[in-house]
């Protein structure tokens, strides 16, 4: 089974208000195992970059109202292709595979808006699997952001200083496999027991309040002692 773990970065929250996609990142899974195949592209949104969005992902310093050269980790967009140049290639990559997305409704509305403006086929909503919904169902009332799930599953996200579509997809792939129990399943053992930490040394049987009475009769005990005495030096427990 092929799945595509996907993320986008945008200029804002609403494509119908003129916001656009500026980055797409995706990771391919086969039978819940990463293949190493990825899709990654930066996109010129053909508009300015709001300061708020830039603060999230650091993409497009050359499109700010006060344009400037990029600093470390920032990516310029004026020299990148517009969506019309990459849309078909994106569809060719995902094909009809299930799309694993965190907060899928957000990314899907942007992807389908961009595809609609190009006159390309829309992606059916049921092709997307929302890991945010899965997390909220599994852990009701708990934080379900990508960062929160990384903390829950002890997934290293120290490189995630700014949002980035490909990095977030790689992290989400690990989170997704944890959510479905597919990453190093422990057959119901706790994490500490499975890793060897907090194992048998931490477990102690509870003392029985009333000791059990022996069910061996006096005759049986005498017969056993006579049998042991008869074995003498041939007993296994006397051998070196």
Name each model-derived stretch.
Residues 87, 143-146, 221-224:
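Alpha-helix initiation and N-capping motif
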Residues 177-240:
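Acidic two-metal-ion nuclease catalytic site recognized across multiple nuclease folds
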Residues 1-125, 136-139, 148-162:
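Conserved non-catalytic scaffold segment of RNase H-like nuclease domains
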Residues 86-89, 175, 227:
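A ubiquitous structural signal for well-ordered alpha-helices
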């Amino acid at each position: 089974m092929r799945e595509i773990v996907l993320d986008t970065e945008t200029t804002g929250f609403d494509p119908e208000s003129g916001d656009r996609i500026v980055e797409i990142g995706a990771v391919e899974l086969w039978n819940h195992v990463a293949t190493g195949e990825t899709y990654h592209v930066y996109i010129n949104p053909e508009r300015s970059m709001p300061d708020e969005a830039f603060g999230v992902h650091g993409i497009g310093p050359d499109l700010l109202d006060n344009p400037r050269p990029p600093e470390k980790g920032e990516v310029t967009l004026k020299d990148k292709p517009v969506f019309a140049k990459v849309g078909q290639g994106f569809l060719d990559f995902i094909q009809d595979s299930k799309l694993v997305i965190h907060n899928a409704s957000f990314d899907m509305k942007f992807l389908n808006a961009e595809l609609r403006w190009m006159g390309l086929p829309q992606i059916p909503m049921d092709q997307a699997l929302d890991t945010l919904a899965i997390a909220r169902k599994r852990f009701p009332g708990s934080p379900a952001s990508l960062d929160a799930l990384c903390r829950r599953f002890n997934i290293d996200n120290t490189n995630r200083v700014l949002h980035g579509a490909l990095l977030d997809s790689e992290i989400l792939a690990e989170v997704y496999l944890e959510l479905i129990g597919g990453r190093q399943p422990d057959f119901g053992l706790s994490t500490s027991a499975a890793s060897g930490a907090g194992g048998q040394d931490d477990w102690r049987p509870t003392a029985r309040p009333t000791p059990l009475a022996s069910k061996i009769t006096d005759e049986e005990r005498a017969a056993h002692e006579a049998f042991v005495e008869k074995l003498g030096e041939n007993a296994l427990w006397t051998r070196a």
